[in-house]
A protein has these predicted regions:
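Conserved nucleotide-sugar donor-binding catalytic segment
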Residues: 1-83
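Non-catalytic, C-terminal membrane-associated alpha-helical segments of glycosyltransferases
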Residues: 60, 66-67, 74-129
Length: 129
């Protein structure tokens, strides 16, 4: 049981290296942005959606309360974090249109953020049983 807290603010640069937005909790104003279609890339569509939005507004507003519970299933599309590395790389290569070298450097930043920075936002909660 963990509580994932959001950063106090979420600029594009921070989202570039890590998807901090839980897609089941993220909302955007359709009247302002219009309908944004998700990418045809099978995985990481949610990350690309929020990157598209933050390209327009630069910083997202964070709601500091928990809005949902997320259940991790063993065989879900995103269960294997190692398998997702190639999909994250595809975000840099295809979505951002970066060359191989720059995308590789971005993956180093991504891994640093995932392994060092993002765990700071995860808090263990005590069971109420």
């Amino acid at each position: 049981n963990k509580r994932i807290e959001a950063p106090n603010n979420l600029p594009f640069r921070k989202l570039f290296f890590c998807n901090y937005v839980g897609n089941l909790t993220g909302i955007y104003e359709v009247n302002y942005f219009g309908k944004i279609t998700i990418s045809s890339i099978r995985k990481r569509q949610d990350w690309m959606l929020w990157l598209t939005i933050l390209k327009k507004i630069k910083t997202a507003q964070v709601i500091p309360e928990s809005l949902a519970y997320y259940r991790i299933r063993e065989n879900s599309i995103s269960a294997s974090k190692f398998e997702l590395l190639k999909d994250n790389f595809a975000v840099y290569r295809i979505f951002h249109k970066l060359n191989l070298f720059v995308a590789s450097i971005c993956m180093i930043g991504f891994l640093f953020t995932q392994l060092i920075i993002k765990p700071r936002y995860s808090k263990t909660i005590k069971s109420s049983t």
